[in-house]
Amino acid sequence: MDIRRASDRLETKISWLDSKHSFSFGEHYDPHNTHHGLLLVNNDDIVLPGAGFETHPHRDMEIVTWVLQGSLVHQDSEGNSGVIYPGLAQRMSAGTGILHSEKNDSWRLSGERHSDPVRFIQMWVTPDDSGIDPGYQQLEIDHELLRGGLVTVASGMPRHRDQTAITIAQKNAALHAARIAAGNSVELPAAPFLHLFVARGAVTIEAAGELTEGDAVRLTDTGALRVTATTDAEILVWEMHTRLGG
């Protein structure tokens, strides 16, 4: 069990962006902190209104974006576009190569101007195979989250094939999310590798103690642990059944 506090994260901060990295990213490199299981990136990004990431390339990566506040506009070279907001998950398969941009929407869904930043978590996992076709999918799951349990957001695992979830091209990984009311609990799946990130609030985990916003725990070969919210909380959990290099 490896607990990583919010203050331990690497950070990129410029005029329009505050990005906190759970793993090595960009100019920040730590050879002892490159991934956990199949997860290479878990970035906690805050982007100011009217700003964002201009068109840039990706290749051979499954990228899942989860918005916590505000709205984010996506456009890519495959002709896909969409506005992502809390409760709507997005997956982009980079495959043989894709160009895309991500920007703070600068508009509320009502069409009114606003001055709010957008905060989102972007997560990258490796695909089963390189050189697949680029792809895009988004899915509204806000209703499922209201139930308070662990919801499968994205998965390539055969057992989730019949569930309402975004598909990813990685048969050994699944992303789950939960919005947990204070005092309530969820049970984590048992897996060789788990990564739990506290996106909001605070939780306690069996054998790990309390985690607060921005904290994470990396679990290896643990059973099904119980997570209890000490305040209203939102968590993101990667379940992985192998690691990079097998």
Residue positions per predicted region:
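Jelly-roll (double-stranded beta-helix
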Residues: 1-246
